[in-house]
């Protein structure tokens, strides 16, 4: 058994999730690969596996039960947070992980190939690239935890939206001023997240066109 298996299992249960042993094992394989590649490719500033478990895996898992179903785009995915974690837990969901950083996408593509994952692809491009917009089309859910600015994220997501699409933004503090700027066009539901062993404010913002 993986040394972090029980810790991840207990953490996910505290988040209200009932993940299978297979899903937990896949998540830990992903973390092991991230730790290994991080030594050479600097994929994340977090190097301690125990800290990674909390700040990457559990943090990403904290939004899982609040995400609507459907095809998902993760913008600025970096090393795959939260997109890869969602894909591993929900094999029925089609996921596209998008980032402009070649090293990070190379890591994700290799991991996808090694595990023969069928529901997720990684694409190296900029979110505003018109060819990318034309090729990928529209999504039901668009996630990100990379954008400092909510308005920037909404602007980047806009070409990928259909009428019912949900923008799911992972934030620390609630960006009240930015929400005010967007309220004429988007409804916004704020969900307070409680990540086990993380003593920081975390929120999920679910935005939808009015």
Swiss-Prot record:
Quote the InterPro entries the UniProt record gives.
Answer: rRNA_ssu_MeTfrase_G (IPR003682), SAM-dependent_MTases_sf (IPR029063)
Annotated residues that bind S-adenosyl-L-methionine are located at 76, 81, 127-128, 145
- The UniProt record lists the EC number as 2.1.1.170
A Pfam family it matches? GidB
Which reactions appear under catalytic activity for this entry?
A: guanosine(527) in 16S rRNA + S-adenosyl-L-methionine = N(7)-methylguanosine(527) in 16S rRNA + S-adenosyl-L-homocysteine
Q: Which UniProt keywords apply?
A: Cytoplasm, Methyltransferase, rRNA processing, S-adenosyl-L-methionine, Transferase
Major localization listed first in the record, in broad terms: cytoplasm
- Annotated GO MF terms: rRNA (guanine-N7-)-methyltransferase activity
Gene3D superfamilies, per this entry?
Vaccinia Virus protein VP39
Q: Where is this protein found?
A: Cytoplasm
Gene Ontology cellular-component annotations: cytosol
| The keyword Methyltransferase appears for this protein | yes
* Purpose of the protein: Specifically methylates the N7 position of guanine in position 527 of 16S rRNA.
State the family it belongs to: Belongs to the methyltransferase superfamily. RNA methyltransferase RsmG family.
Q: What is this protein called?
A: Ribosomal RNA small subunit methyltransferase G
Species of origin reads Acinetobacter baumannii (strain SDF)
